Amino acid sequence: MAKVLTLLVLRLLMNLLLIGWISLWIIKPTTIWIQSWRQAEDTARHTFFGYYGLNFAVFSFPPIALSIVGLIYLSLLPQHHHPTRGGRGAAITVSRPAIINSFIGIVSCFEILALLLFLLFLAWNFYARVSNDFKKLMPVKTMNLNLWQLKYYRVATRFGLLAEACLSLLLFPVLRGLSMFRLLNIEFAASVKYHVWFGTGLIFFSLVHGGSTLFIWTITHHIEEEIWKWQRTGRVYVAGLISLVTGLLMWITSLPQIRRKNFEVFYYTHHLYIVFLVAFLFHAGDRHFYWVLPGMFLFGLDKILRIVQSRSESCILSANLFSCKAIELVLPKDPMLNYAPSSFIFLNIPLVSRFQWHPFSIISSSSVDKHSLSIMMKCEGDWTNSVYNKIEEAANCENKINNIIVRVEGPYGPASVDFLRYDNLFLVAGGIGITPFLSILKELASKNRLKSPKRVQLVFAVRTFQDLNMLLPIASIIFNPIYNLNLKLKVFVTQEKKPSNGTTTLQEFLAQSQVQSIHLGTDEDYSRFPIRGPESFRWLATLVLITVLTFLGFLIGLSHFFIPSEHKNHSGVMKLAASGAMKTAKEKVPSWVPDLIIIVSYVIAISVGGFAATILQRRRKHKEAPRMSKEVVIKPEERNFTELKPIPITEEHEIHIGERPKLEEIMSEFEKNLRGWSSVGVLVCGPESVKEAVASMCRQWPQCFGVEDLRRSRMKMNLNFHSLNFNL
């Protein structure tokens, strides 16, 4: 009872922090807030914390506090807890696809609502600022502008604030270990889309802001004078130009046409974000930067934690080479490491490339495989083909390689086993997109039947019969009735007319499939190189708190040292200020001094966080790991794919040759076999064409919006769409 009450209090606190931060953004452009905030800053200047401490506490700390409270909340939840299964009252769903477009992807109703609210906020912010500017137009001292030029110049300036709003949210969606999206059960693979949206908005508003400013400077013949100016106080224009150019370069190289063909160009160019953020700080000033700081702060700490984790080495224990040029890699893991189905890891193999990291879905279940973790990759690119060749060489070489060292980051995945909330599951996979469903089916096979979905329909589309070998890791689950999954599998082979081995059923084909199993690791490696995974949520919350206190301490300390303090001689200051003979302490020093203080404080704080993470990592590594052997990690009955014996089954799975799946017909057939009304989770993973086809089906399918609709209709189900695709 006490734990439930604690969770409720934490949830309330998170809502208050989020509402408070959003409210600050809404009231920020109002005249009342501007006047009140100036008075608050004047008062804070005479205190120990100063105006910088006040800005950090009000604008930067709420999102960071939300992250800390969220991590504590997640630490108190049962590990990978199962959400309550939805009933009739939960008929309405916000995951229903509303827009399906090849350029912007698949957008749900909830995402459209959130996007409209954000655009409404931007419109309000822009209107409030511009209307206030037009009421009190002040001429620019260095330029002689007429009325329309002055108005246009003010409008251009305010577009910069819209870019600032996008930048403040830009880095939150790409957090991994410290991601707040997992509180909404939104996976990293899905949240990357929001990063793209915010980045596009940032570049658009920045281009309007910078281009319009350059236009005014050009027509007034001040461009050469203004563009290279590094002002002692105020905005540094050359820094703004640097920020705009680097941001535009990152955006161009992230376009799908460039990113997919030249991933390395995209990857390395994106590291210019450091230059972009530093230039933005010098251009906008410290006061504006406090709004952007939360995302940057959490992203920097998250990056350091990932670097610390990725420095730990693991190894490949065994590999299974399938005839379709797919590889299953088995890695050792700590038995205490648990992860949700559909989780993924980032993998680096120094033997192939020291710098390239690639994401792969985990195909094993931590409920079943306590000592190992498995992934599968399809060899379709240079890096994956190199991995395949290296492992093949290791198998054929007389002097066999004892182990292949790898580095792993993750696992990352949903905070809860979300698919268990549905009464039934409809899974659609295309090619290598089957991988997240392998872990889901293994998880379902290990669960109590009462907690699992009643029926599971898997639609698997491949180009050739050889691609069906990717089903081998779950062959025993598919054909063995003891698992009682009530699984129906429909396989579609689109580019071949008959199998080369003359088989007629899926079971016969898989039984005759050739798999080359290679054991690389020694018995010692099973205990030397286990994957331990990210740190616990509670420890992460503590680390964030330590880091933020370090930042605040150095921010205040360095500011007191380098910026003249006013609170020591308050009476003298008031006399000088009344006579107009004194400028504020902020105006005494160049504007880049507070900016440098923020940078130095940030670097020190992140370094302290990285040092603490390194110490904990070493402590975990030096703890005595439980001894494991090859027999424990790789069970013969699970890994010997070539001895798949025919098992009598009650329902034969279907193979359709030379045709594509007709999803509407399959869904209608699936609905006929349901008893009573139920919620259906529709999960898809595969190429964009497959994802869009499934989304179109869900959008066109009739939907009920309440109990009365259900009574009047003859519908048996509501569809809830989820895409498991990972796209960088």
From Swiss-Prot:
* Any one annotated GO CC term: mitochondrial membrane
The UniProt record lists the Ferric oxidoreductase domain at 159-281
Chain's gene name: FRO8
What does the record give as the reaction this protein catalyses? 2 a Fe(II)-siderophore + NAD(+) + H(+) = 2 a Fe(III)-siderophore + NADH
Q: Where in the cell is it found?
A: Mitochondrion membrane
Which membrane topology describes this protein?
A: Multi-pass membrane protein
Tell me the keywords, alphabetical order. Electron transport, FAD, Flavoprotein, Heme, Ion transport, Iron, Membrane, Metal-binding, Mitochondrion, NAD, Oxidoreductase, Transit peptide, Transmembrane, Transmembrane helix, Transport
What Gene Ontology molecular-function terms does this entry list?
ferric-chelate reductase (NADH) activity; ferric-chelate reductase activity; metal ion binding
User: Please, which domain of life does this record's source organism belong to?
Assistant: Eukaryota
Organism the protein comes from: Arabidopsis thaliana
What are its GO biological-process terms? monoatomic ion transport
* Database matches in PROSITE patterns: FAD_FR
Q: Where is the transit peptide?
A: 1-24
Tell whether Transmembrane helix is among the UniProt keywords. Answer: yes
UniProt: heme binding residues: H195, H209, H270, H283
Q: Name one Pfam family in it.
A: FAD_binding_8
TM ranges: 56-74, 104-127, 194-217, 269-293, 316-336, 537-559, 595-616
EC number(s) given by UniProt? 1.16.1.7
Question: Which protein, by its recorded name, is this?
Answer: Ferric reduction oxidase 8, mitochondrial
Principal location: mitochondrion
Q: Which SUPFAM superfamilies match?
A: Ferredoxin reductase-like, C-terminal NADP-linked domain (SSF52343), Riboflavin synthase domain-like (SSF63380)
